[in-house]
Amino acid sequence: MEIIKSILYFILAGIFEIGGGYLIWIWLRDGKSYLYGVIGAVILILYGIIPTLQPSNADFGKVYAAYGGIFIVMSILWGWKIDNIVPDKFDLIGGCIALVGVIVIMYAPRG
């Protein structure tokens, strides 16, 4: 159950980081209202809180290193579903490699 909860926190953090960053991106790059930037900034602050909900035995470095792998995969998915940029085989291979890293860093048994 802890692993499922941990993965859900990673996914939630990814949605907040990518979503908040995207709102700031379209504010500055696409000329949207400054409110997009404000909302994006608030979402990014919330993103910073979510990783603290990870299990207490996971230190900052491990959580953020593993989150990097999740971020890679979620960014590829965001580009595909939101910006209609279809990932190629190298994107998919790289995403799978990143997920293997997440599993090793966060969930490999240590003794």
UniProtKB/Swiss-Prot annotation:
HAMAP family (UniProt xref): UPF0060
Family of the protein in this entry: Belongs to the UPF0060 family.
Disulfide bond positions: none
Stated name of the protein: UPF0060 membrane protein Cbei_2176
Keywords, in A-Z order: Cell membrane, Membrane, Transmembrane, Transmembrane helix
Localization, UniProt: Cell membrane
Source organism per UniProt: Clostridium beijerinckii (strain ATCC 51743 / NCIMB 8052) (Clostridium acetobutylicum)
Transmembrane segments: 7-27, 33-53, 60-80, 85-105
PANTHER family per the UniProt record, alphabetical: UPF0060 MEMBRANE PROTEIN YNFA
